[in-house]
């Protein structure tokens, strides 16, 4: 194409993404847009076309971002190229959202006409504003009997401060208002700014592993252009590759010869190792490289750590491969090998949050067929020792001994909960129970409140979200962000079975709750660990002090069965002999800990 054609084509490109809270109808709206632009025939349409993973369809949530190229003929008779980048809405996947937004110029903000603005909506809007995107508000689900479009309009104006007077009322399910949205995209979203004659700069916003083509990168061209056969260079790692294939998704993948400014597509260059393609890196040409990198994404730091161990020890290498492949498309997953006396060899993995952790586990079990044992999730603590050294502890078993610890700091988050005002009491009680500090409370309208607390992250990671949902009948929504580390009175609690510490059951707890937690866990383990031929003491200890104990009674054979009414000394002889045997057994016996026991350490708050 000559320069003029390229410039005209560039003016016709619109890159946008859809942002919304979970369940506000983002994926359904994406389906309707695909249908309206004729990307898919009615026969090929299925619910949530862009959610390709089985897990996404089952849970009805979007996990991975997706990019699609659509052709749309607008009312002015011109044909436009729209790139729709679908994003997840759940708090754990904010980094997926921030990656999508970096590749766009506009965003459609979907708000549920019945529920109004939720915590996640706000968080995503702020992300979009940080990226200077044009935001188009859309009020979805107007066909619901409880929909109140005017109230939601007012809310968008009051809470976010966007002008919502021309927000499009739509129903993605019934297909109402889709055309107006497309017209608004063409009108309001600016075309990509970029210079086709400059050296190539392309932003990698996602990558995945394909068994045949190696690593495939999803890219957005910012300046210049790239053709099949070009030698390209990754700017972060400095490695060079030859482009073997370029493609666009219309949801069906189609190969193209070149990608130009503003295009969103995929690039494969027979890249074999996962580490060579970093999400957020810039691709440029090896011959005439760009001078600077594009402002990429910030590196996402894991918030939650837990150990993953294969139940079958022989599958250790398979687990490593599985994690490497998942890490490809999931920039936020981190892992390193670790060993545990109780569980053998495995990995310490870092995740963004509990949903992220659950999904990775489920994907490993499904896609790679590996059965896992998981240990209790923990966060990173900063421990200052008496000698003045600061250690970062992501695993309770790495905690130094009590007498060597001077102080421990734990991460705190600022949690914003949006809720109907009937549940304010229940939420405040829950946050107080989780060691939260009350910061602020705002009424959004007459029925809804935003409550802000500062809470230790370790209290949120396990079941805070579930408890929040159950204490508000599912109406509350949560968003949280890290605010830094603070000193806390924390201790490490060890669990001893048969007087030996089981490293995988250790956890870190606030000193005030140590006694209660110890008691609950000891009772739980007593119920879960199968009885042995000898009695097993179960103890919870803080340092050298035992704070709770329970005993799993021994199974015993009835040795007196064949003594009919016999002599007491005969019975005593048999019982003494049995007692001797049990004593010997206890010295050499080892205790098997079932998987449920590890999980029970997690779910102790439910009692």
UniProtKB/Swiss-Prot annotation:
GTP binds at residues 23-28, 140-143. GO terms for cellular component: plasma membrane. It is a peripheral membrane protein. CDD domains: EF4_II, EF4_III, LepA, lepA_C. Pfam families: EFG_C, GTP_EFTU, GTP_EFTU_D2, LepA_C. Keywords: Cell membrane, GTP-binding, Hydrolase, Membrane, Nucleotide-binding, Protein biosynthesis. GO terms for biological process: positive regulation of translation. Its main location: membrane. Residues 11-193 form the tr-type G domain. SMART domains: EFG_C. The keyword Protease does not apply. Its EC number is 3.6.5.n1. It catalyses: GTP + H2O = GDP + phosphate + H(+). SUPFAM superfamilies: EF-G C-terminal domain-like, P-loop containing nucleoside triphosphate hydrolases, Translation proteins. It is found in: Cell membrane. GO terms for molecular function: GTP binding; GTPase activity; ribosome binding; translation elongation factor activity. It is an enzyme of class 3 (hydrolase). InterPro entries: EF-4 (IPR006297), EFG_III/V (IPR035647), EFG_V-like (IPR000640), EFTu-like_2 (IPR004161), G_TR_CS (IPR031157), LepA_C_sf (IPR038363), LepA_CTD (IPR013842), LepA_IV (IPR035654). HAMAP family: LepA. Required for accurate and efficient protein synthesis under certain stress conditions. May act as a fidelity factor of the translation reaction, by catalyzing a one-codon backward translocation of tRNAs on improperly translocated ribosomes. Back-translocation proceeds from a post-translocation (POST) complex to a pre-translocation (PRE) complex, thus giving elongation factor G a second chance to translocate the tRNAs correctly. Binds to ribosomes in a GTP-dependent manner. Belongs to the TRAFAC class translation factor GTPase superfamily. Classic translation factor GTPase family. LepA subfamily. This is Elongation factor 4.
């Amino acid at each position: 194409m000559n320069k003029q054609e390229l410039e005209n084509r560039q003016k016709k490109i619109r890159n946008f993404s859809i942002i919304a809270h979970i369940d506000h109808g983002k994926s359904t709206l994406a389906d309707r847009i695909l249908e309206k632009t004729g990307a898919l025939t009615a026969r090929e349409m299925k619910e949530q076309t862009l959610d390709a993973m089985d897990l996404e369809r089952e849970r009805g949530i979007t996990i991975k971002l997706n990019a699609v190229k659509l052709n749309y003929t607008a009312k002015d008779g011109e044909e436009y190229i729209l790139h729709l980048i679908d994003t997840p809405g759940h708090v754990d996947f904010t980094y997926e959202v921030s990656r999508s937004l970096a590749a766009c110029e506009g965003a459609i903000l979907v708000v549920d006409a019945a529920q109004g603005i939720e915590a996640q909506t706000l968080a995503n809007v702020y992300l979009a504003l940080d990226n200077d995107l044009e935001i188009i508000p859309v009020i979805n689900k107007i066909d619901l009997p409880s929909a109140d479009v005017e109230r939601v309009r007012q809310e968008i104006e009051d809470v976010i401060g966007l002008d919502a007077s021309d927000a499009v009322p739509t129903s993605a399910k019934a297909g109402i208002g889709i055309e107006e949205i497309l017209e608004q995209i063409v009108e309001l979203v600016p075309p990509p700014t970029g210079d086709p004659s400059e050296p190539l700069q392309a932003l990698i916003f996602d990558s995945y592993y394909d068994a045949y083509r190696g690593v495939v990168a999803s890219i957005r061209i910012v300046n210049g252009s790239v053709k099949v056969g070009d030698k390209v260079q990754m700017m972060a790692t400095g490695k060079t590759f030859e482009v073997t294939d370029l493609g666009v998704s219309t949801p069906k993948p189609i190969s193209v010869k070149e990608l130009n400014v503003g295009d969103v597509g995929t690039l494969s260059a027979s890249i074999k190792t996962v580490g060579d393609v970093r999400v957020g890196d810039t691709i440029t040409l090896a011959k005439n490289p760009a001078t600077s990198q594009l402002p990429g994404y910030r590196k996402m730091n894991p918030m939650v750590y837990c150990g993953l161990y294969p139940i079958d020890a022989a599958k250790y290498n398979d687990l490593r491969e599985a994690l490497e492949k998942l890490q490809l498309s999931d920039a936020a997953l981190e892992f390193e090998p670790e060993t545990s006396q109780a569980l053998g060899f495995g990995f310490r993995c870092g995740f963004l949050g509990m949903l992220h952790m659950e999904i990775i586990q489920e994907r490993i079990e499904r896609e790679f067929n590996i059965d896992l044992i998981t240990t209790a999730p923990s966060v990173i603590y900063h421990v200052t020792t008496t000698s003045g050294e600061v250690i970062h502890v992501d695993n309770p078993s790495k905690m130094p001994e009590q007498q060597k610890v001077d102080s421990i700091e734990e991460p705190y988050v600022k949690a914003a909960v949006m809720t109907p005002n009937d549940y304010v009491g229940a939420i405040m009680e829950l946050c107080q129970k989780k060691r939260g500090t009350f910061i602020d409370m705002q009424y959004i309208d007459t029925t809804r409140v935003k409550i802000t607390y500062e809470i230790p992250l370790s209290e949120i990671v396990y079941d805070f979200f579930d408890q929040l949902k159950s204490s508000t009948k599912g109406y509350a929504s949560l968003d949280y962000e890290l605010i830094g580390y603070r000193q806390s009175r924390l201790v490490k609690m060890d669990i001893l079975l048969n007087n030996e510490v089981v490293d995988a059951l250790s956890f870190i707890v606030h000193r005030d709750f140590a006694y209660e937690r110890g008691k609950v866990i000891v009772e739980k383990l007593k119920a879960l660990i199968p009885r042995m031929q000898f009695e097993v003491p179960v103890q919870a200890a803080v340092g050298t002090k035992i704070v709770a104990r329970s005993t799993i009674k021994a199974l015993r054979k009835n040795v007196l069965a064949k003594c009919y009414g016999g002599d007491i000394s005969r019975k005593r002889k048999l019982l003494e002999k049995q007692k001797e045997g049990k004593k010997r057994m206890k010295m050499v016996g080892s205790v098997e800990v079932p998987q449920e026991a590890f999980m029970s350490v997690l779910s102790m708050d439910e009692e």
